[in-house]
Amino acid sequence: MLAAGPFVLGAHLTFADGAGDPAPVKTEGGKYYDKEGNPTFKVQSDGTVDWSTYSGFRRYHSDCHVCHGPDGEGSSYAPALSSYLKTKSYSDFANVVVNGRKNVSTAQENVMPAFGTNRNVMCYLEDIFVYLRARANDAVSRGRPQKHEDKPEAATQVENSCLGLKN
């Protein structure tokens, strides 16, 4: 498990090498997982995205796009996350988000703050990963997904629990 301030992540924290095949092979509580156990996306032939991808889009644009740019494409001072997730697993992503990262050399100074105690990020970390993974694999285009699955009851329960709300 990964401890992050008052949060404990780990229900599906994996330690696979790289991103792997994003194809969903398992569903649990309305979420999809690949063969390595990484959270992943599901996009139907009509363009309907799963709830996690849609939620991830919303949460990414709430907390991450200021530095990493619209749709995970990067900015002048933060890398493109859509490219980063082509080779990284959920555990790699979670480690950087929870603990932050500092990459300093004579030519650059890139610092990402730790978000391990930010409930607006941590309660939706899998969703943010799923959205960015879908972008990295060109499964969703830029902009807000037009159609999405309904929010699963399990997602509401997990969200309320993480945010300290009553179910």
Segments from the language model and where they lie:
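Axial heme c-ligation environment in periplasmic c-type cytochrome domains
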Residues: 17-20, 75-82, 100-127, 132-152
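Short, low-complexity, Pro/Ser/Thr/Gly-rich segments in the mature regions of secreted, periplasmic
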Residues: 149-167
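Bacterial N-terminal signal peptides
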Residues: 1-8
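Electrostatic cytochrome c docking/interface patches
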Residues: 18-59
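The canonical Cys-X-X-Cys-His
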Residues: 60-70, 93, 97, 112-113, ...
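Solvent-exposed, acidic/flexible segments
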Residues: 49, 53, 57, 86, ...
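Sequence context surrounding c-type heme c attachment/ligation sites in exported
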Residues: 54-65, 74, 88-94, 145-147
